[in-house]
């Protein structure tokens, strides 16, 4: 009776059971296929977001003057990216007028470069960061978007300084075995190679040519054509810390007490800009800022590009002279803070960089 009742009550029971069994057979492949499709879409989107557009060979990431002074400030399209000394050197951004100050990273940065939609810099969290990732020290050459997102390590090695040149970052790579050598890595990390075994400072660059001084047999001015990575002699002088600006190479004259000179790439002439002994300098569009080395009257100085009208910016010893379109930033030697600034052109007015303290 129960069997007869069940068979008549549910005459399609065996059919339904068969359909259910069939569904069980295809539902797993459908789920697996859906998950695979989602993974493919995620990877495609991630690849698109991580894509680094090509740069023209003329693109450079920062000025030689800024990079020779630590690369603590870099500017592009009205935005300034800087290593905030008031917050352990962490990466910040702001407008050129020092408004809209924003923290971008949780680690100390230097040698800041900007090109296109990306930032390139040396990052080191040895001074302390936040979160589990900072339990172990990490350092290296990094790339991120302009807002600090999508952080990517291009080379987990120590870097002395670096310069963006077109689609490559040229950098002085250092370790205790090989010491300092010049490497380059493509901005999308697809290529990395040794450029030279010698110590080459890549900071001074124009239109794909890196200008650097010799460090082994002489202190001549050399050019490195990044299109072929070939080296040639530009000027047989005795110079240090070359900086390119408007067809001139500004440099410290080693043979004459480190006075500041400039060499014309147009007519191959040399001009003496000051007889002061110079510790460091930076060249802007209107003025040269330099630290005068003097036992009696050390001072941060500025003068016009041809060496005329020298004037004192601040008495004492200063370092880390970085220039933006609005201000010249610097700090006292041996002291990270306070950071001072003065308008990069116009009347001198030295005040603390208070916007960075907020």
Model-derived features: where do they sit?
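Beta-strand-rich domains and repeat architectures in extracellular enzymes and scaffolds
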Residues: 58-90, 106-111
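N-terminal Sec-pathway targeting helices
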Residues: 19-37
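Repeated scaffold domains used in trafficking and secretory/extracellular systems
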Residues: 67-74, 107-116, 156-166, 197-207, ...
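Short loop/turn segments that connect beta-strands within beta-propeller blades
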Residues: 95-99, 145-149, 185-190, 224-229, ...
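Blade-level signature of beta-propeller repeat domains, shared across WD40, Kelch, NHL, RCC1
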Residues: 317-358
């Amino acid at each position: 009776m129960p069997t007869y009742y069940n068979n008549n009550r549910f005459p399609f029971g065996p059919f339904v059971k068969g359909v259910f069994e069939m569904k069980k057979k295809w539902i797993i492949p459908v789920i697996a296929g859906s998950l695979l499709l989602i993974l493919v879409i995620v990877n495609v989107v991630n690849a698109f977001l991580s894509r680094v557009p090509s740069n023209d060979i003329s693109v450079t990431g920062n000025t030689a003057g800024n990079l020779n002074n630590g690369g603590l400030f870099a500017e592009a399209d009205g935005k300034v990216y800087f290593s905030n000394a008031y917050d352990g050197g962490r990466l910040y951004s702001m407008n050129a007028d020092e408004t809209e100050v924003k923290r971008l990273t949780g680690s100390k940065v230097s040698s800041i470069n900007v090109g296109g939609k990306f930032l390139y810099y040396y990052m080191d969290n040895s001074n302390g960061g936040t979160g589990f990732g900072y339990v172990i020290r990490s350092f290296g050459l990094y790339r991120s978007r302009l807002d600090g997102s999508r952080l990517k390590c291009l080379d987990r090695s120590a870097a002395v300084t670096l310069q963006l040149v077109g689609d490559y970052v040229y950098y002085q790579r250092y370790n205790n075995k090989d010491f300092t050598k010049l490497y380059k890595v493509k901005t999308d990390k697809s290529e990395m190679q040794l450029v030279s075994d010698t110590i080459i400072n890549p900071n001074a660059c124009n239109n794909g040519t890196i200008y650097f001084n010799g460090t082994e047999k002489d202190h001549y001015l050399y050019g490195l054509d990044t299109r072929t990575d070939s080296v040639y002699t530009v000027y047989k002088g005795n110079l240090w810390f070359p900086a390119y600006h408007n067809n001139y190479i500004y440099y410290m004259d080693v043979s004459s007490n480190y006075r500041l000179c400039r060499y014309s790439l147009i007519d191959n002439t040399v001009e003496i800009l000051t007889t002061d002994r110079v510790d460091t300098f930076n060249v802007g569009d209107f003025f040269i800022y330099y630290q005068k080395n003097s036992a009696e009257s050390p001072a941060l100085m500025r003068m016009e590009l041809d060496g005329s009208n020298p004037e004192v910016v601040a008495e004492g010893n200063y370092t880390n002279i970085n220039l933006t379109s609005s201000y010249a930033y610097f700090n006292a030697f041996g002291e990270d803070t306070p950071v001072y600034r003065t308008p990069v052109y116009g009347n001198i007015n030295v005040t603390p960089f208070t916007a960075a303290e907020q």
